[in-house]
């Protein structure tokens, strides 16, 4: 999932070091601690979008609640799938 549409606006979304740093600062937790906690997952998604927008010079300007209100369950599920698929993708790339 490389972008997300919130309130009709396509925004970049990717995991970056900045996203992990934002998440740690906002929650006091590491990304590995997300587990099945929906609030932590939404917060990490927010951090990924905020960080990608910052890196790409795209205006973001939403707080966490506004962002969450504009998300769908499908957005969250798609992002959760990319989180669980990421280690397998890395493994297959290094094995090839």
Write out the residue ranges for each language-model feature.
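Charged interaction scaffolds used for protein-protein
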Residues: 1-10, 18-43, 51-96
